[in-house]
Structures are given as structure tokens and as C-alpha cells.
């Protein structure tokens, strides 16, 4: 090796050592954690299997509250339902800020209900919750919308005549159509090419965010953003979806009837008109598009992915599917469509759906938060704007609440008498002020779609149950189930 190269390496090593020695600890009162290197943070201590595995390993050493440096920035990690509840419920206001997901932040930039903060978030959340409730309780309730969509699904599955299929885009279609009926005022045919294109962009984006590159980008986005990578594809995908939404908004402008708004976009446009003289109004074009995109994305990917996990688990554990079917026969019968009030009489089915959500662990690290003020927490001081990760997976896999946390077992949610048993550690929708605003719709979709399919079809796989692999294909921000083939066989 040339002398000049050796001298350069020696100089670089010396500089790094000097930085480590002189690196001022500006976060002396943050929770403890592995010692970071300048710029690199805790990169060298990370588990190559991903961020979640790294955080779980750090928890073993530092407990339920600790600090990890993702690149140069400190992030406080909260594990276990007690710490998560203490933050999100007992100190709800302080922990109500929204952090950033590096792969999508350049696109959203704090707009839309999911990534907004401060007054903008309060205005958009209040509007979204109220409008979704109003359109879900009018002439056609959310339950009726889901029941109608479920019947469309049954017709589509019958057309398959028991052929092998990948259910990904069909499950996306049914969940997307529910949110589309509320936001856009219409549903789409399952073969609509523009609709399928949007769903493919959502699927690809969620997968890329959850990929190994997505996790690496979370650490070093300030550097990696200047180079080619999956982040650019994510930005392009979101631009394309946003363009479609913008086109839909213009169509709504042309047909808007102020006396009879037909969906969420119409209602938003009326708010814009009402507040057009207010220079500080949050009812802007940008918030309209990105709020719509946020609801469209969240209302599609999360529930459809849970359904995909659910039917993969039914293939893996056919005795569970058979027991659910027996309960459907007993309570509903073979002909009447399932209704939400049936849930109270179907504890086993409800337990299975809860266990699917718990086991699939769809957002294992939650969605990042920030503290809105200097906050005292368990003897530590968390400075304002510090990021906080709520590791929901540690609640959903807590052995104190779930006897066999790594196994799929509906008995986790049943008491000794077979009645439904709820537990405070079951928090797939998170907690507090940022709890998923679509929780009610998602729970209704899961029950009605799941039971309607099992009422009408049995399932078969080309793979023996014992050979079905449940290992996720990606596990980052989201947990993506493996692709699989399934037959839906009419009963």
C-alpha cells in the first residue's frame, strides 16, 4: 500500500478518535443507550437483520427506555405496554408530535393528517374524523358499504372457479374501495387499470419503505438522498398517486353542489371556499391532496396486509379456519350476510381476528413521534423535538400478557369459559392522541370481509400446512407477509 494512503488512513483514524474524545454530550439526561460514534451513531452496533432486531437486543441491556443514535440523531425508544401507555396516555400532549419517516418526508413535508403537527394536525384530524363519521353514518353506513363490497368480492372469487391465485391485489381492492367510497364518492371495478396501477404503486411504496434500504436510509438520509436509490422510486410513486388525486379534485370542482356534498373531497372544497379570506387557513390545496393521499394509503395498505396475513395463517392452521366456519354456521348461517352485531356472539372468530393482528404485528415500530416540549420521563429529560419510537411489537409480544408470544394462538384472547378476553397489551392501532383515526373502519372491515369469505369458501394451498413459511419478506417500518398462492373453493 502506498505511503500516502497509509498516512491518509492514519490521519482519518486520529481525527475520528479525537472527535470521539472531544464529542460533547449534549444529551446527558437522555435515557442510556449504546455509545455513539460521531456521524455514524450506533451503526456499528446494529444487527444486520434490521432495526427491530437491533432495538430488541438493546432492550435486553438497557431496559424499556433507552436512546439509540440513528446516524447523528438521538432517538428515544419506548418498549413494553407500560412505558408506551405512560407516554401516549399519561403524558399525551407532550408525546403527541409526529416524527418523520425519512423515505416519505421529502414528499409530505409535514402536510396531511398523518405527518402534520401543531394546529395543522388538529384541524386536519378534526376534519377527517368528523367527515369520515358523517359519510359513514348517512344513508349508507360504513357497514353497508363493506357488506356491498364483500358481496362484490364473493362474486369475483366465484369467477376464479377454485384456481390458484395471489390474493394481494384483490384484498387491496376491497379495502381501497371502502376508503374510496368515502373520499372520492365511488368504488372501482377490480379490473380498472388505473385503479390497479394506483394499488400497485401503494404496494411497491410500502414494500420499499420497509426494505433493508429503507432502514439504512432512515439512518443516513441526509447523505444518501444525494445518490440513486429506492427513495427516488418512492418519491416518483407518490408523485404519480398525487397527480391522480389532483385530477380527481378538479373533477370534483366541476361537479360540486354546495348544498349536497357527496364525499370528503367535496366537503373539503366547501371548507376551502368558506376560509378563502383567511391567509392562515389550513384548508389549502396542498393539504387537500396530501390529506387525501394519507387517508387513501393508510386505509388501503394496513387492512389489506392484515387480511393477507390472516388467510396465510388460515392455510397454515386449517383447524382454526374450520372452527371459525362452525361458529359462522351456528350464529349467522349459510345465507344471511354477516353483520357487525354478530361480533358479540362470535368470541372465537373475534379472538382469531385479534390474534391475526397481534401475530402479524404490521407496524412493529409504530409511526415515529416527537416530543412537543422538554419532557421529564422516568427520571430522564427528553429535549423538545426529540424523536421517539414506540416499539409496538414489544407490547404485542409481551410474555406477561401472551403465554406464547411467538406462536399463533387465538386462546391468547379467550378466557377459561371461551369468552372474549381483552388485554391492555393489544395495541395494534397505537394509543393516545395519535391513535389510528380509521380504527373503527378497519375493525369493521376485518370482521365482515373475513367472515363473509369463510362463510362462502374453504381454502386450499399447493403447499402442505407444515411447509408454509410465515417469515415476512420485509420487516422495517412495516412487516410485509410473504407472497403465496391460494384456492378459494365454494362451499
Curated annotation (Swiss-Prot):
Effect upon mutating residue 172 to H: In allele CYP2B6*6, allele CYP2B6*7, allele CYP2B6*9 and allele CYP2B6*13
GO molecular function: anandamide 11,12 epoxidase activity; anandamide 14,15 epoxidase activity; anandamide 8,9 epoxidase activity; arachidonate epoxygenase activity; estrogen 2-hydroxylase activity; heme binding; iron ion binding; monooxygenase activity
Obligatory cofactor(s): heme
Induction of expression: By phenobarbital.
GO cellular component: cytoplasm; endoplasmic reticulum membrane; intracellular membrane-bounded organelle
Annotated phenotype, changing residue 391 to N: In allele CYP2B6*15
GO BP terms: epoxygenase P450 pathway; ketone metabolic process; steroid metabolic process; xenobiotic catabolic process; xenobiotic metabolic process
Known EC number: 1.14.13.-
A Pfam family reported for this protein in Swiss-Prot or TrEMBL: p450
Positions bearing Phosphoserine: 128
Chemical reaction(s) catalysed: N-(5Z,8Z,11Z,14Z-eicosatetraenoyl)-ethanolamine + reduced [NADPH--hemoprotein reductase] + O2 = N-(14,15-epoxy-5Z,8Z,11Z-eicosatrienoyl)-ethanolamine + oxidized [NADPH--hemoprotein reductase] + H2O + H(+); N-(5Z,8Z,11Z,14Z-eicosatetraenoyl)-ethanolamine + reduced [NADPH--hemoprotein reductase] + O2 = N-(11,12-epoxy-5Z,8Z,14Z-eicosatrienoyl)-ethanolamine + oxidized [NADPH--hemoprotein reductase] + H2O + H(+); N-(5Z,8Z,11Z,14Z-eicosatetraenoyl)-ethanolamine + reduced [NADPH--hemoprotein reductase] + O2 = N-(8,9-epoxy-5Z,11Z,14Z-eicosatrienoyl)-ethanolamine + oxidized [NADPH--hemoprotein reductase] + H2O + H(+); testosterone + reduced [NADPH--hemoprotein reductase] + O2 = 16alpha,17beta-dihydroxyandrost-4-en-3-one + oxidized [NADPH--hemoprotein reductase] + H2O + H(+)
Mutation effect (residue 262 to R): In allele CYP2B6*4, allele CYP2B6*6, allele CYP2B6*7 and allele CYP2B6*13; slight decrease in activity
Effect of residue 487 to C: In allele CYP2B6*5 and allele CYP2B6*7
Documented effect of changing residue 140 to Q: In allele CYP2B6*14
InterPro entries on file: Cyt_P450, Cyt_P450_CS, Cyt_P450_E_grp-I, Cyt_P450_E_grp-I_CYP2B-like, Cyt_P450_sf, Cytochrome_P450_fam2
Membrane topology annotation: Peripheral membrane protein
Subcellular location: Endoplasmic reticulum membrane; Microsome membrane
Keywords: Endoplasmic reticulum, Heme, Iron, Lipid metabolism, Membrane, Metal-binding, Microsome, Monooxygenase, NADP, Oxidoreductase, Phosphoprotein
Broad EC category: oxidoreductase
Function field: A cytochrome P450 monooxygenase involved in the metabolism of endocannabinoids and steroids. Mechanistically, uses molecular oxygen inserting one oxygen atom into a substrate, and reducing the second into a water molecule, with two electrons provided by NADPH via cytochrome P450 reductase (NADPH--hemoprotein reductase). Catalyzes the epoxidation of double bonds of arachidonoylethanolamide (anandamide) to 8,9-, 11,12-, and 14,15-epoxyeicosatrienoic acid ethanolamides (EpETrE-EAs), potentially modulating endocannabinoid system signaling. Allele 2B6*9: Has low affinity for anandamide and can only produce 11,12 EpETrE-EAs.
PANTHER family, A to Z: CYTOCHROME P450 2B6 (PTHR24300:SF406), CYTOCHROME P450 508A4-RELATED (PTHR24300)
Record family assignment: Belongs to the cytochrome P450 family.
This protein's name: Cytochrome P450 2B6
Organism: Homo sapiens (Human)
